[in-house]
């Protein structure tokens, strides 16, 4: 591009018709000219179109039943949690489309407030995966933060604003898009108050963090350091409004079930105890009857609980669910390993009793679905080491003995190819 300097006023912008003297700059192309004012206008139009495309359109927003159906393809079990999340997410993005306000039947403006989500349940039962799958479906920025790394401002550790930086980074620094994203804060039970009564000494990683999270959970204009770390007065900040950011806060809350049973009167020991099998106890939704006062007794402050009105709970996965997780979802572990072996030209087969044995091992270890991959790696490591160096293996079969007794998987050799017969008449 050539830039036109001083000269006559015969040169005009090909778009608005203004002469060179009427504008600050006129830039020339092959037979055309464009002025600085038209360039600014083009930039504004492009920015508006990009902002519109990054928003979740209401007519495209899936209904709660569709959200739940999508989750079914990836997450096994946890039906109650799926329903709760589907409704909460649908209402949240419907509220964003309404611009935080809606009109009732009398034509009065009604302000629609945000409903963040609290997820309760044991480790390895799908809390994080549910949130990740939701974000994938809605095509919105998603960030995971660990509450245990957070401390109150002014102390060693991460500020709560660093959570927002992760979301901005997930949106490729598009702040407008980040403002409609989802933040998942894990291990929130670890920032519970150390005692039920407020302490005289400062609890910088417990109650202090809860206090620091209040504003961003509710919705505020936050100043985020672009490089992370601590704030200092001489640096520039990224401004982000958290009013439309959906927060999903989760934790295992070990010990909360005892607080609930003490309140409801369900005795676990003694002559009046309910007699239940171990399987029933393991798959019971311990948190179905949770009330705000139980969470306060556990160590969450009332203001923090008040900003998490939607409560979803997940249960321990039983053997049947773990077997389904191994083989049924779209990206099931068995399908992943079959694909890995296919890349080496080898078939991989798991017998049904092998899948059940892997599920039993995960239950014994108490790691839930998260432990399935570790068990699969242990079982398949010897053959995954040998097979790339061999060309005589057709199929690998994993049985229950492979899992339980540390026996090598059965290797089925490739049939030798017969040499082609030559025609004697040739």
Curated annotation (Swiss-Prot):
Q: Give the residues the record marks as binding ATP.
A: 122-129
Which residues hold Zn(2+)? 13, 16, 35, 38
InterPro entries per the UniProt record, alphabetical: AAA+_ATPase (IPR003593), ATP-dep_Clp_protease_ClpX (IPR050052), ATPase_AAA_core (IPR003959), Clp_ATPase_C (IPR019489), Clp_protease_ATP-bd_su_ClpX (IPR004487), ClpX_bact (IPR046425), P-loop_NTPase (IPR027417), Znf_CppX_C4 (IPR010603)
Q: Which residues form the ClpX-type ZB domain?
A: 1-54
A Gene Ontology molecular-function term? Answer: ATP hydrolysis activity
The biological processes this protein is annotated with in GO are: cell division; proteolysis involved in protein catabolic process
Instruction: Identify the SMART domains for this entry.
Output: AAA, ClpB_D2-small, zf-C4_ClpX
Answer yes or no on keyword Nucleotide-binding.
Answer: yes
Q: Which GO terms describe its cellular component?
A: HslUV protease complex
Which keywords does this Swiss-Prot/TrEMBL entry list? ATP-binding, Chaperone, Metal-binding, Nucleotide-binding, Zinc
| Family that this chain belongs to | Belongs to the ClpX chaperone family.
Q: What does this protein do?
A: ATP-dependent specificity component of the Clp protease. It directs the protease to specific substrates. Can perform chaperone functions in the absence of ClpP.
Subunit organization: Component of the ClpX-ClpP complex. Forms a hexameric ring that, in the presence of ATP, binds to fourteen ClpP subunits assembled into a disk-like structure with a central cavity, resembling the structure of eukaryotic proteasomes.
Record's protein name: ATP-dependent Clp protease ATP-binding subunit ClpX
